[in-house]
Each structure stands twice: as C-alpha cells, then as structure tokens.
Amino acid sequence: MQGNKKCADGFSDTSSIGSVLDEADREVSNLTDRAFRSLCISEDTSFHDSDLALSPEITSQVSGTFHQETVSHANRKSGIWSQLPSQGTEHSGWAATFQQQPKYVQGEEKYPKNSPLPTPVQRRLEVPISGLRSSSKPISKVSSLIRSFDRTEAQPCDSRPPPSKPPALKNTPKFAHPPESGVNFCFDSAFLTVRRVPAGVSSTHQSSHQPCRAPGEPEPPTNPEIACHSSDSLLRAPDRVAGSCEPRFPSPSLKPPKAETGRGKEWISRGTFLHSENSAFESWDAHQPKLRERKDITETTPESKAPKHYEDMPLLKEPYPAESKLSPCQGRANCAQEENRSPSGIQSTSGAWGARDSGSQVFPVEGNASQIDPQVKRNQAPWRKPKTGKGGTDGPHDASEDKKQPNRKGLPLYSKLNPQGQLPENGVLDLPEESSDHYSSPFNISKLLTPIISTKHVLETSDTQPVETSPSPPGQLNGYQEKESSEAQSRDSYKSKAPSLLFNLKDVRKRVKSTYSPLPLLKGFDEKTRGKLDGKQEPLSNGVTLPNGLEENPPTAELVKETLDDAPSVLHSSTQKDPAMDSRESFADSHPTFSSPSASSKTHFSINGEAAERNSHEKEEANGESEQGLSEGGWHPDSRENLPRKHLSLKLCNRDSETGQATEKMKPRQLEKRLSRSISQETEPEREMGFQNLPVSQKFSPGPLSPEEEDVFYSDSQSDFTPCVQTKAKFSTSSSDQSFASFEDQQKMWFTEGPREDGKSHVSLGDNQKDEKETEVEKEEPQQCALHNGVEEHRQKETQRKAQGVLGGRPRKASAEEVSVRGSWTGADKDTALSHAKDPTPLPASTNKHRLFPIKDNTLRATPVIKPIILPLLRTVSSEDSLSGGHKENELPRQPWGEDAGGLGASESQEMRNTPLSNSTPSTEQKCVVYEGVEEDPVHTAAQDETSQQTRKGSFSFLPLVEEGGKTKPPPDTADERLAHEKSRSADSGKLEAPQHIPTIALHSDDLEDSPPSLPQHTCWEEQGFKSHFLSAPRAGPSGRRPVPSEAATSPNPSSLGGSSTCSPAASSIWEDASQAAGEHWQRQEPPGPGPWASPGPSGPTGLTRREDMTRGLTWEAEGSDPHLERLADFRTLSPRGIFLTGAAEKPEPSSLLEKAAGKPPAVPPKTEKALRRAKKLASKRRKSDQMSEKHTEAWEGKSFTEDAQGTEQRPVSPGKGPRPRFPEVRSLPPPTHRHSVSCGWEPAGRRPWGSQSLIPLPPYPATQKVLQDPQSGQYFVFDMPLQVKIKTFYDPETGKYVKVSVPSSEEDPSEPPLQDALTAPYLLYPGFQPVPVTSLMPLRCSSQLAAPTFLRQGSSHRPQSSQGARLQPPPERLGESAQHVSSAQRPRGPPLSPEEEGAEAPSLSIISTDDLEDFATEGVS
C-alpha cells in the first residue's frame, strides 16, 4: 500500500490500496477515483463521501494512528506526502480504503469512522455520494480511468474540481466516480486537509461531506463541511483535513482547486500526469523534492499539529462548512455553521448542524491539523499548498488564526475557532505564496482549457492578483497565471478553471444540449458569479454595508456572511476573502436582507483577492457564527458594523465608477490578504456549495462548479478576462461581480458561457433562486449587487444544472435573485438599479463576467460564420438588440422568459438583455451617461470596455472592424460606434455578437456614416446590442449557435452589453433623451449599423428595437434574416413569424451582403459546433422559406431597394407590425413581453434616431400612407395608399400571410424621394446596405415610443405612423409601400387585417400610429 500510496498519491494511477484490493482493482479504483477527484469536485464529493467515509475511519487509524508515521508513510507512498503529513496519512488510509472505498469505505468506512456525525450530515452527503458513487462505484474502474484521463487531459481538475463544485451537483452524475475520484481529489486537495487531520476531524468532515452529499449535491455535501473546509481549511485551515475531502470537495472550486491547482500546477510543470493517479504523484515524488520537504514537514507536523489543526479546523471547517453548506443547502450550511458555532456557543440556530458541529469539534485536532496544514501545505505539493496557504505556518497559522478571529471576527464565538480564526490569516498569507508555487500548473491548465475557467480567475486574479502580484493583473487573465502572482488567486483561478475545464470537456455538451444557451450561460454565469462574487461580493457590499459589516461584525456579520455564503454564492468568492461576510452575503442573497449586496460586495472583494481573503477570514468566523448568520436579518446590524472592515473593497459598490477603485483596492487587498486568491478558490467551492447547498434555487445550479469554471472565464471576462478592460475600464470589479449579475438566465451566462454576455440568461437559476429572489427582492437594490454575485453564481449553477429549466418561467420576483440577477437583475434589478444607473454600477461586474463568457466562448466558433453573417447579424443585432431592448428587458424578464421557449430562451434573452445592462453596466452606465450626457465619451468607454471584452471574445471579424470604427475611431461616432460595437460585440458574442456588431460594422463599412451616426449609431448599436442581447439570450438558449450562451449565459452579455443600457429604464430614458437629442444621429447611426447591411436588416434590427412600435416585428424580421438564422434556427421554428423574420431580414434587397449574411448561419456562432450546424441548417431552411415568401413579393418589393431603403426608414412601423410577430418566433421564448420590453427600452432609442430621421419625413404620412413590408426584402415601406391604387403583395409578418395592398402608382416615385432623403441622412448613405431599414427599424421603435412623443404631433394618424411617416415618409414610394406594409403589418399587429381591410385601411388608414401598431403587435405578440 505504501508503494501504491506513493504512486497513488492523490490522483495516483496505480493501485494505492493495492493491499486492500487487487492491484489491478486498486489501480483502477485509485486511478478512477483520484482522477475523478482531480477531475472535478463532483468527484471530490464522491471521493469525500467514500474517501472521507474511508478517511474518517482511516483518518482515525491513519490520521490519528498513522498520522505521524502514516503521514510520512502516506506522503511518501502516495506522493501525497507533498500534500500534507496528515493528508498523506489519511491518504495512506484512504488509499488503502479508497480502493476498497467504492465498496467498503464509501458508505461503510465513512460511517464507521464518523458514525455519529455521518448520520444526519453524512446521510445527506451520502445521497449525492450515492449518486456519485453509484455512478462511480459501478463505473469506478473504467469510468474512473476515463475520468483519470480526463484529469490527465485537464490536470487542472485538481483545481478544477472546486469550480466543478456546482457542477458537482449537476455533474456529480457526470463524475459518477467522484467517490473514487473523490479520493483522488481528496488526495490532491481534500486529502490535503483530510489526510492531515486526525480521524476525528476526518470523521467530522466526512460527516459533513456525507450529509452534504446526501441532499443529492455531491459537491455541496462536500461543501458543507468538506467544501467549507476545503475552502476554509484548504485556505485558512488547510489542515482541516478531517474534511480532507470536505475542504477539497466542499469548496473544491475554491480551496481544493487551489490545493489542486498548486498540485496540478506542479504536476503540470513537471509534465507528469498527476491526473494519471499514481504516475502523476510518483512523478511528483520524483520530480519535486520540495514537495517531499513539505511532506516531511507535514509528517512531522501531523503528530503534533494534526490534532491541533483539527481542533481549530473543525471550527474553521465548520464555520466554513456552514457557509459552504449554506451555499449548497441552507440546512446543510446551517448544520455546518452550527457545528462550527456549537463549540463557539453561538451556534444555536441549527441544532442538527450543531450536532454536526459537535462532531466536527469533537475532533479538537482540527486546530493542530490546521497548523500543520500551513506548514505541510507549504512543504508539500501544491495541492497541499492550499493547505499551507490555509494554515500559513503551523505556529504562526494558529496565531494568525487567533489574531484573525479577533481581528476578522472579533467575536467570542471564535474563542474556540481562534486557531481556526488565525489560521485563515496565515493560511491566507501563506497560501498566496504557495499559490505561486502551484500556480504554474493551474495557469497551464488555464491555457490548456478554453478560457472559460480563466475568465473567472482572471477576474479574481485581475482584482486579487494585481495586489498580490502587480505584473499578473492583465496577464493573469488565466486564473493560472494569476496564481503564480497571487497563489490564493491562482488557486482560486485554478480551482475555478479546473472545474470549468472539466465542464468544458465534459459538460459543454451537456450544457449546450441542456440549455444550449441558458445552461452554458447559466453555468458560465454561475462560475462567473462565483468569480465575481470572489472579487465583487465584498465590494458590492458598499452598496449594502452587509459585506463589509460582515467582515467587521464578527458574530453577526460573520453569520450573515456565512449565511450569505450559504445562500447565494457570494460565499464562493467572498468565502475566501471574507467568509463571514461572504456567508452573510450568500445568506443575504438567499435571504433577502441587506446582505444581498453584501454578497455582491463580498464577491467583489473576493475577486479583489483581499475581499476573497477577507471573506475567508470572516468566513471562518462566519462559520463560527453561521448559525447566527442564518438568521440573516439579525446579522445585518453586525454586517454594517463589519462594513467598515470591508469598506476597503466596499467601494466597489459603485460598480462602474468604483470598478477601477475596487480593482485597485482589490489589489491592495490581495497584497494585504495574499491568500485572496487562495481563499477565493477555497471560498469559490464553498460559494458554489453555498449556491448548491444554500438555496434550492441556487441549488438549481447543479454545477456552480461548471459555471464556476465558466465563471472563471466569466470572471476573467468580468474581472480579468476583460481584466484590462474591466480593471481599466471600470469593468474589473463591477464586472467581476456583476459579470454574473448579467447571469440572468442566458443572460447570466456571460457570453454564454455566457458568462459575461451570456450571463444574462442565467435565469435558469431564477427558478431556484426565485425563493431566494423573492426573499431578496425586498432588497432588490442590494440584490443588484448581491444578486449579481450570488444570483449570478446561482445562475451559473443553474446554467450548469438547468439553465434552461430554471430559466423557464421565473417570475421576476422568483427570479428576483436569479432572474433579478439574470432577468430581474436586468429586468427587475436592472429595471430598478440599472435603470437608475445604480444597478449598472453593480452590473458592470456582471457585464464583464458575461463578457467573460463570451471570452470563454471566445472560441466563437461562428466567428468565421459571423463574418458571413455579419450583415444579417447586424440586422439581427439591431433586431435582436431591439427586441432585447430595454422594454423587452424590463417587461420580458418577468414574463417572456418563463413563457416563451419554455421560458428558457426568453428568460435567457430577457436576462441576457437585462444583464446586458449588467454586463454593459459600464457600458450601460457609460451608455446611460452617453445617452443622457454625450453618448460619446461614455459610449466610447463602454465601447472600449465592451470592445475589449468583445475583442477578447474576438467573436466577430468585424468586431475588430467595429472596434476599429468604434474603438479606434476617435470621433464621437467612433465612441458611440465603439460602444455600440462593444455592445454589439458583447451582445453578439453572447448572443449575436455579429448582429450587434453588424450595425456598427455597417457603420464601419459605411465610414461616411460612421461619423454622423456616431452617436446615433452608438445608440443604435446600443439598441441593437440590446436587442441582440435580448435576442441573443433566446438565441443562445434555443439555438446552440450563439456564443452568447457563453456570453448570454454569463450575462447575456449581449444583453448586458447592448441590452443593458437600452434595457434598463435608466438606459431607456437615457436612450430616450439621447434619442430625442441625438435622434437624428441615432436615426442616421442606426441605419449605418443595420442599414449598411441591409435596409431591412438595419431596419429590422432597429425596428425590432422599436418592436413595440411595429419595428419589433421588423427587427425580428431583419434579425431573423441572419442572426435569426441562428436565432431563427431557434426561434423561427418556434414561431411562423420567425420565418417571416428571416424573410424580412433577408428581404432587405439593398444589402446583398445582408442577404448573403442572412443566407449564412447567424453571425454569433452557436455554442457548439453541432449547435452551429443546427443553427445554420435552421437558418438556411427558414431563410429559404422566407426567401420563397419574399420572392413572392420580391417583384413587388422590387420597387427598388432605394424604396426599400426608404422603406427601411419607414420600416419601423412595419417591423412593429410584421416582424413583431416574428420576433416571438425568432425569440420564441419571450416574444410578446420581450417585444414590448424591447420596445420599451428600444423605443426611446428608436425615437432618438427617428427623431432625426423623423425630421425628414415627419409629415409625409398622410392617412393614405401605409407601412408595409416587402416579403422579399423584408423591408417596411410607408405607402401612400391614396395616391395611386396599385395592388402590391406584401407580407404580413404578424400573420405570415401575403397581403395585397393597393399602393399608389406614384408609390415608387415617393419611394425614390424618400430614398434620396434616406440617402441624405447618413444612415441612408450606405452603398451596399440600406441604412434606411435600420433607420426604419429604429424609428419603428421610436415611432412606437419615441416617435409618439417626437412624431405624435405629426399630422399622421398616430405617433407611430407619424413617426414612421417622418422617418419613412421621405420616400413617398416608401411611404406608400410602408403604408401598404403597415396594412399588412398592421393586420398582424392587431386583428390581422384582411387584405381588403388593409387596402381600405391604406387609403383611410391615416397611417395607423405606431402606437396603434405597437398595441396590435403587443396584443399579437404578447
């Protein structure tokens, strides 16, 4: 066994329990189990369950008996010696029992060892364990081997498992072998703690682990005690090895990942496959004498220190478990907290957990183990290092812990927890140092993996590492690089990354399949939220003093923090930094108190690193006070007291403005805490666990780990992935936390993975978080921050677990936390806060995170596709953005997501486009500033941020173009364009990066218009981006094609970016102001964006933006053309209108490019290749159908693209009418509300562009004019019906039928003049593209809402028509055509008008006002 141990260190390949089982069996068992453990937290959980079960007994024997000898023996044997003496000891025991563990240890040894504790807690853990184990036991050999190889492939699994923690819930089945793998994992990370800790501690942790698992959350089970320990023990009390698995698995994403990160890092650096079980560890043994040193120290320490560590550790562990448990399961968390506090005497909330705490505390060795852990960690392998970081130094660790207790907690509860309390401090400090040691591996892993994991860590790294390591902030985008600089961060990053990688590898399919967009988005958002929470939870606190107060108020604040940790997921990142604070925040998230923002703030701090560390410290204390924290309301005062302490990071409350400050602060914090990343990592798992454990809603995110991994990406995007942009552009901190604020459904899937831009869609969390949300709704404003963090994390989890189901009808309040973070976040929270530009402050983190997801989805596989689809995408962006517009965001979040597309796409869309506000918070805030103020500089900044994110995403070919035009171009137009472009990019990346960019691209393509429409285009882009975000979410969800699932999943970053500003009322109002102020520009601009691509395209997108005004339909139509090819692939099938939309989008004959793009798959690539192909197929089919329909009228519509362009200008009316129905199709998920929502948000925007355009054709809409859509071009034309009765066939987008309308013969003539007019307008001056359509689209929206005020005075029948008349009227022909189209479109709008009715309407139409049309559309669409 010793020989085996040597080989089977933690992830040994060989049979580490050769003595117990067959050598082959053992080998396979160890290989599978350890590989799995390394592979994912789910594994870790399984491992903890079985191995911990084994570990308790073996820990008792090995840890207690062998602890000294076995420490060296196990360490020597398994190569885990590098991990920790106790760890080695436990490992030896574990290795021996683990191999038999699947059979015996899994349920037996664990129970025997921890017989008393496991009963209540273990059972819970066991349930998940059983699930994991069930899969693992039977599949232990082969499956484990496969997992082992996966681990080999993603050695970061060590660190990844913690991030996988949420995935553990979701992927636990995936990692069916976690039991065995759990052993592996434990060996790397949990073993760090478990091996090192005496049997008693192990039993306690096992008990914690088991109970946590029992609930069916493999990871959360580990999390309550083990996860908490993992995050707390590995970081603070690494030697809390009692829950070796627990710490490792419970907070696998944070703490174990850190440990594993270190280990993986070292392993990777060695090039050995630690994941290859024995060989990896052997390799390490051979290659890393330093690890041996650690092992020796560990060995020495185990005898004397293991007990002490466990004494402290149980408390730390317990407190942390409380958080962790709270996260996965509040009950669990409570138990953990109670356990933690039982000794403290403050744990009176949870009697059951109090018992558990007793079990945990029964093993006083925790304190020693904790002390040992630091040394061992330092001296042992990187996976152990997390422990060292946790324990810092044996003696100093205790002292530090003691100090920390008074310092951080300052509560009597921690007299017992004092060692533990001090432990985190040294551990935090040490861990960062160690993090650097094993950071390389995580970093490598990060590079290895898709940037998904990187994002979150980058976020934390950027925020946290900058302090720890000045050089690594930008470069640390990968969580791994950061780890080098800041070990804590690196570990956290690695941890997040590893699970993310794992999820990418293993769950990407599941994610894509499950909730193609929503699941990945939510997943990404969860992760992102986690990362965000890490960096942002704390800072967000400044919005709510809770997080800071948590830190300062030892008992209450800590409790709150712990509870918070338990609740949302703030715990995940905050847990590391400020456990108590995080817990509180998490709890606050879960329990709407003022803690919600705390959670965000904490998360922010976590990301800042110091925040994470602070959270970790506080978490320890909070663990001690978890019970108290459970009564969330009670701790708020303390939270406020603690506020000052966290005030450092608290600053981040102003997400946008303070993002930079927070980022900077994060850096100091990082330096200050040094364990920030480590703690963050540790906390991350806890947070994940908290998410899983705390609220059922949050539990929805089965894979906060996966989302966490994605969150890593998201975080990176939010915090560090777009760290430069984030940190520099104020995205850093805000985005960091809020990146998942965008986590709405899809929305919250950042970019689908949304993470940043996808993040928005992470409403999937919404369902579960609904409870949380409802609770937090009361603190919706704080929730904006906290929810952004916690809910985002939740969303991440939900995204992983059920991005699509949850996202389904989350009431805005039900989603208040999740949906509020995703949908309500961007819908309600965004409505409330972003609208007020307050949420935008928090949302930036979300935004960035969401963007991060797009970064993760940076593999926008459709980037090439995006190029071809650029025009259609532009249109789609316009359409989608319009649809995703503020109205959609505001309204739809509540209604459409749940309703349409099973509420998934809608929720995704809604939240995506809501989160866009979050995601675009900087963008939104900047946009708001831009729209309210100059729309230029802020836009530019936002554009820069978004461009950076988008650039990172590199989603679209024209992202650079747009970036060039928007980012590179200095003119206001450029700024606007850039902003719009950024938004488009974000939106596009997440949902339709191309669509959003298309308008901007169009702008770029039409440089002549670039300048004049600069502001308008920016607005337009924003609107379009909004739309795109919104649509993107649905698109991301329904259609795999969207990278937005990444982007949208994270935030619907597209939504967040584009939709954020348009989406939020604040943005909306700003847009309205800007619309009116820059109406002309916007009008001009909008066409340049969409117009250049295709009159219908721009018109469609813009119109979609004003979908409420009729442009919605058109926008969708335009959108349907290309983006909707992707999206329509998703939505068109959903609704016949989708076809029309596609047709409309393709119809814009003026833009061959547009049509070309329309012919191609949506610009924003689906999340997966398969999804992309599917999207392409659907798009092609729909396009063909649409084209057939178009061709019906193409001859009619052949009037001229000039007319079309003019018609496009007028199209807004029609889009509202026609595409509006189609919009639901395209956005099958939330068509009606979204339309209205989009209309709401977009109308103001539309108004503005149309304000200028309206100047041109304002009066031309006589009663004789009708707005009709050309089926061929999909453009809307205003026709002067009375002029000449010429029967023309128009396609009614609403009804999907062709209507013969009498169009005046002079129709073409008027069309010509309007065309000239349109051409006169910058937006109309697009050679290849018909800017008019864009204008049309924008005006449509505008006409509906903006036009009403702007054009209501128009003599025309109503403001809408007036508005359209004003915009579309310039070309009489277009007017006539538009009038005709209005007839057609109008029919769909309201009761479909029969052709005669339409014809009659045309002459006596008096131009149905866009309002009327909007009403019709609303009726029809809604």
Curated annotation (Swiss-Prot):
<protein>
    <recommendedName>
        <fullName>Cardiac-enriched FHL2-interacting protein</fullName>
    </recommendedName>
</protein>
<keyword id="KW-0597">Phosphoprotein</keyword>
<feature type="modified residue" description="Phosphothreonine">
    <location>
        <position position="119"/>
    </location>
</feature>
<feature type="region of interest" description="Disordered">
    <location>
        <begin position="877"/>
        <end position="1127"/>
    </location>
</feature>
<feature type="compositionally biased region" description="Polar residues">
    <location>
        <begin position="461"/>
        <end position="470"/>
    </location>
</feature>
<feature type="compositionally biased region" description="Basic and acidic residues">
    <location>
        <begin position="284"/>
        <end position="298"/>
    </location>
</feature>
<dbReference type="GO" id="GO:0030018">
    <property type="term" value="C:Z disc"/>
</dbReference>
<dbReference type="Pfam" id="PF15232">
    <property type="entry name" value="DUF4585"/>
</dbReference>
<feature type="region of interest" description="Disordered">
    <location>
        <begin position="1"/>
        <end position="23"/>
    </location>
</feature>
<feature type="modified residue" description="Phosphoserine">
    <location>
        <position position="327"/>
    </location>
</feature>
<feature type="modified residue" description="Phosphoserine">
    <location>
        <position position="815"/>
    </location>
</feature>
<feature type="compositionally biased region" description="Pro residues">
    <location>
        <begin position="1087"/>
        <end position="1099"/>
    </location>
</feature>
<feature type="compositionally biased region" description="Low complexity">
    <location>
        <begin position="590"/>
        <end position="606"/>
    </location>
</feature>
<feature type="region of interest" description="Disordered">
    <location>
        <begin position="199"/>
        <end position="265"/>
    </location>
</feature>
<feature type="compositionally biased region" description="Polar residues">
    <location>
        <begin position="944"/>
        <end position="954"/>
    </location>
</feature>
<feature type="compositionally biased region" description="Polar residues">
    <location>
        <begin position="201"/>
        <end position="210"/>
    </location>
</feature>
<feature type="region of interest" description="Disordered">
    <location>
        <begin position="279"/>
        <end position="443"/>
    </location>
</feature>
<feature type="compositionally biased region" description="Basic and acidic residues">
    <location>
        <begin position="1185"/>
        <end position="1202"/>
    </location>
</feature>
<comment type="function">
    <text>Plays an important role in cardiomyocyte hypertrophy via activation of the calcineurin/NFAT signaling pathway.</text>
</comment>
<feature type="region of interest" description="Disordered">
    <location>
        <begin position="516"/>
        <end position="718"/>
    </location>
</feature>
<feature type="compositionally biased region" description="Basic and acidic residues">
    <location>
        <begin position="828"/>
        <end position="839"/>
    </location>
</feature>
<feature type="compositionally biased region" description="Basic and acidic residues">
    <location>
        <begin position="653"/>
        <end position="675"/>
    </location>
</feature>
<feature type="region of interest" description="Disordered">
    <location>
        <begin position="459"/>
        <end position="500"/>
    </location>
</feature>
<feature type="compositionally biased region" description="Basic and acidic residues">
    <location>
        <begin position="975"/>
        <end position="991"/>
    </location>
</feature>
<feature type="compositionally biased region" description="Polar residues">
    <location>
        <begin position="342"/>
        <end position="351"/>
    </location>
</feature>
<feature type="compositionally biased region" description="Basic and acidic residues">
    <location>
        <begin position="635"/>
        <end position="644"/>
    </location>
</feature>
<feature type="compositionally biased region" description="Basic and acidic residues">
    <location>
        <begin position="395"/>
        <end position="405"/>
    </location>
</feature>
<feature type="modified residue" description="Phosphoserine">
    <location>
        <position position="472"/>
    </location>
</feature>
<comment type="subunit">
    <text>Interacts with FHL2.</text>
</comment>
<feature type="compositionally biased region" description="Polar residues">
    <location>
        <begin position="907"/>
        <end position="926"/>
    </location>
</feature>
<feature type="compositionally biased region" description="Basic and acidic residues">
    <location>
        <begin position="611"/>
        <end position="622"/>
    </location>
</feature>
<feature type="compositionally biased region" description="Basic and acidic residues">
    <location>
        <begin position="790"/>
        <end position="801"/>
    </location>
</feature>
<feature type="compositionally biased region" description="Polar residues">
    <location>
        <begin position="1353"/>
        <end position="1366"/>
    </location>
</feature>
<dbReference type="InterPro" id="IPR052303">
    <property type="entry name" value="CEFIP"/>
</dbReference>
<feature type="compositionally biased region" description="Basic and acidic residues">
    <location>
        <begin position="481"/>
        <end position="495"/>
    </location>
</feature>
<feature type="region of interest" description="Disordered">
    <location>
        <begin position="731"/>
        <end position="850"/>
    </location>
</feature>
<feature type="compositionally biased region" description="Basic residues">
    <location>
        <begin position="1173"/>
        <end position="1184"/>
    </location>
</feature>
<feature type="compositionally biased region" description="Acidic residues">
    <location>
        <begin position="1411"/>
        <end position="1422"/>
    </location>
</feature>
<dbReference type="InterPro" id="IPR027838">
    <property type="entry name" value="DUF4585"/>
</dbReference>
<feature type="compositionally biased region" description="Basic and acidic residues">
    <location>
        <begin position="579"/>
        <end position="588"/>
    </location>
</feature>
<feature type="region of interest" description="Disordered">
    <location>
        <begin position="1142"/>
        <end position="1244"/>
    </location>
</feature>
<feature type="compositionally biased region" description="Basic and acidic residues">
    <location>
        <begin position="524"/>
        <end position="537"/>
    </location>
</feature>
